[in-house]
Amino acid sequence: MFYNVVKEYPDIIVDYSVSRFEKFGSAVTLVAQIEFTDHSVRYIKDYLFVDGTRKYSYHWQDAYGQLRARWDNSPHHKHIVTFPHHKHESGKTSPSHERNLRDILEVIRQSL
């Protein structure tokens, strides 16, 4: 799935790599990196567990290593209406409906 989605965005993606992919039954681990046309980078950690639960972090930083945005579902920020899903941006945490690679690539496409 990762490769199929990445191929849909040749206008914004210049390079990508998968540093870890493991599948054990229905459990999946994906650790990857995507470089964009402005040299910003997105670091991906996505874990699907056997019980169907998922843990993810999509960290996007500029070419100088400064955070542009991070989407994750770490179970803190209980006050956010989309808890546990949220977005870190400009020093603030906000609700997030983007929860997968394609949704977040669309946000990045609009920003580039």
Regions found by a protein language model. Give the residues of each.
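Well-ordered alpha/beta subsegment
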Residues: 90-112
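Mid-chain, well-packed structural core segment of small domains
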Residues: 54-80
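Generic secondary-structure transition motif, activating predominantly at the C-termini of alpha-helices
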Residues: 10, 75, 109-112
